[in-house]
């Protein structure tokens, strides 16, 4: 197959949702359709051996939530789909934000009983930075749900994106009978209890068919016909250009747990979602059709293999083709490296990559030299932009139970900060170590990983820090004066960048007023 054909058949997407909307279950079912797994392990079985294939760190297994971003590749409809699983829980936004920089489209999963929730709103804001196309799956139709028209109205008003329903539900909860495909004029009938395998779905042709009344009952059939008249009058038709520009979302209804409706949005994804897109660098735009290799690192994961204490850098291929043993330039450090052992992923199972094309995600073994945001090329000096660090909102001081392990603690924290699990700050005035996170659960993750991966037992204490900003100044003399007078509020982060740590927002505002020549940044490009 030629290079353009390889690139054109790729679809790289992430699933975004509020915690517990069913994202991990959908991930499972998608893999089932892609023949990547044989039976879907029910995610609810926390104590059973059938853990969801994409949740594989120790703590995730105990809690049943996806903490790390894993990558899964599978074939579907003559396309090669790369699915980036993103942490769904409240507290993992920073990793999730960065993962959204590495995809070309997103699937938004909504719990149909609850509608649009807070985390979904935040994540959609991040996709807006790049106008990422969004598909929508209204989940949990096997439970009692809100009125479908209401759900569409809420998405449109809260998320400011037009909805184009592709399928429409027939009943819900115990009365859920299936969905009607508007464009194809076909009804797909639902059978409960078939969730862990791909079921043969009975299809009824035509909305006016008596077979439809016989299958779902007169009441539901008539209700469907009435609702569809309303829908076709009140909602938008699918418009591909508006979808590509992130202005309109095709909406599918179904139940991930019952494995029903998942294939409909997969068909939509492979047919409508964009092939690998162009990316900005600090010098030019790189097109996916270019044959020279380039890519950027958006995540670093420690110890994916419990048997090996290694770290893997996840790289999005932007252009060209990776081939085993090729020489690439690691732009930030100006060094050429031979990559002979890149990995491809199937959540927890790793395989050595012989080749990878634009749109694919590969893993590079990292012995401490690769950082988030690093660019690799076939010689060209450029840096991909738009992979930010976000100022933490929560802070704790971290302390050792055994003071002799200070060196291991620092090493563990710096490694965890490089992979984006947490941010570390070392105040200039004392030997404290302060950990900053975007959500509470990250603190638990850090303590548990320090224990299992670095054999360090640590505990947290409260610390008088409310917020942090990265500080820079073009005038060296003024910067020195600022540093001299504010030493008690300054710290170095894991990458040795100077940071202002403020005990209160009032303190930060005063500092910004007092030093107008100093730039205080809420995000920092990697």
Swiss-Prot record:
Annotated SUPFAM superfamilies: EF-G C-terminal domain-like, P-loop containing nucleoside triphosphate hydrolases, Translation proteins
GO biological process: regulation of translational termination
Cross-referenced InterPro entries: EF-G-like_DII (IPR053905), EFG_III/V (IPR035647), G_TR_CS (IPR031157), P-loop_NTPase (IPR027417), PrfC (IPR004548), RF3_C (IPR032090), RF3_dom_3_sf (IPR038467), RF3_GTP-bd (IPR041732)
Record keywords: Cytoplasm, GTP-binding, Nucleotide-binding, Protein biosynthesis
Subcellular compartments: Cytoplasm
Gene3D superfamilies referenced in this protein's UniProt entry, alphabetically: P-loop containing nucleotide triphosphate hydrolases, Peptide chain release factor 3, domain III
Span of domain tr-type G: 8-277
Residues that, per the record, bind GTP: 17-24, 85-89, 139-142
Superkingdom, taxonomy of origin: Bacteria
GO cellular component: cytosol
GO molecular function annotation: GTP binding; GTPase activity; guanosine tetraphosphate binding; translation release factor activity, codon nonspecific; translation release factor activity, codon specific
Xref: PANTHER family: PEPTIDE CHAIN RELEASE FACTOR RF3
Function (record text): Increases the formation of ribosomal termination complexes and stimulates activities of RF-1 and RF-2. It binds guanine nucleotides and has strong preference for UGA stop codons. It may interact directly with the ribosome. The stimulation of RF-1 and RF-2 is significantly reduced by GTP and GDP, but not by GMP.
Descriptive protein name: Peptide chain release factor 3
Species per Swiss-Prot/TrEMBL record: Actinobacillus pleuropneumoniae serotype 5b (strain L20)
Lineage: Bacteria, Pseudomonadati, Pseudomonadota, Gammaproteobacteria, Pasteurellales
């Amino acid at each position: 197959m030629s290079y353009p054909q390889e690139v054109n058949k790729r679809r790289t997407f992430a699933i975004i949702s509020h915690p517990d909307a069913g994202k991990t279950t959908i991930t499972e079912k998608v893999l089932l359709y892609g023949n990547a797994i044989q039976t879907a392990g029910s995610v609810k079985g926390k104590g059973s051996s059938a853990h969801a294939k994409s949740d594989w760190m120790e703590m995730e297994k105990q809690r049943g939530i996806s903490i790390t971003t894993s990558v899964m590749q599978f074939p579907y409809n003559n396309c090669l789909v790369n699915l980036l699983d993103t942490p769904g829980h409240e507290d993992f936004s920073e990793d999730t934000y960065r993962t959204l920089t590495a995809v070309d489209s997103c699937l938004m999963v909504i719990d149909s009983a609850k509608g649009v929730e807070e985390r979904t709103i935040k994540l959609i804001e991040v996709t807006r930075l790049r106008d990422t196309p969004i598909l929508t799956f209204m989940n949990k139709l096997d439970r009692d749900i809100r009125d479908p028209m209401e759900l569409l109205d809420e998405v449109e008003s809260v998320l400011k994106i037009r909805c184009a329903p592709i399928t429409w539900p027939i009943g819900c909860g115990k009365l859920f009978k299936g969905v009607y495909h508007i464009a194809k004029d076909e009804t797909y009938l639902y059978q409960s209890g078939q969730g862990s395998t791909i079921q043969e779905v009975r299809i009824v042709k035509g909305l006016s068919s008596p077979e439809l009344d016989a299958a779902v009952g007169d009441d539901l059939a008539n209700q469907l016909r009435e609702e569809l008249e309303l829908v076709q009058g009140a909602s938008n038709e699918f418009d591909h250009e508006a979808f590509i520009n992130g202005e309109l979302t095709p909406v599918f209804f179904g139940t991930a747990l019952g494995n029903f409706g998942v294939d409909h949005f997969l068909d939509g994804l492979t047919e409508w979602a964009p092939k690998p897109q162009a990316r900005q660098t600090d010098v030019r735009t790189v097109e996916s059709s270019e044959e020279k290799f380039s890519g950027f690192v958006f995540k670093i994961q420690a110890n994916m293999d419990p048997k090996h204490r290694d770290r893997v850098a996840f790289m999005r291929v932007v252009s060209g083709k990776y081939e085993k043993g090729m020489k690439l330039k690691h732009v930030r450090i100006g060094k050429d490296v031979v990559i002979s052992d890149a990995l491809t992923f199937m959540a927890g199972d790793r395989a050595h990559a012989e080749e990878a094309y634009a749109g694919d995600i590969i893993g590079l073994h990292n012995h401490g030299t690769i950082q988030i945001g690093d660019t690799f090329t076939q010689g060209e000096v450029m840096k991909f932009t738009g992979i930010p660090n976000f100022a933490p909102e929560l802070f704790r001081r971290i302390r050792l139970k055994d003071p002799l392990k200070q060196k291991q603690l620092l090493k563990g924290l710096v490694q965890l900060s490089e992979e984006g699990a947490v941010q570390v700050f070392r105040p200039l005035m004392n030997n404290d170590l302060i950990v900053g996170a975007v959500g509470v659960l990250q603190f638990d993750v850090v303590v548990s990983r320090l224990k299992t991966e670095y054999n360090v037992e640590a505990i947290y204490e409260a610390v008088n820090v409310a917020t942090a900003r990265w500080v820079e100044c073009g005038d060296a003399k003024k910067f020195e004066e600022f540093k001299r007078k504010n030493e008690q509020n300054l710290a170095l982060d894991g990458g040795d960048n100077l940071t202002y740590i403020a005990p209160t927002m009032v303190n930060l505002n005063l500092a910004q007023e007092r030093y107008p020549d100093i730039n205080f940044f809420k995000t920092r490009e990697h």
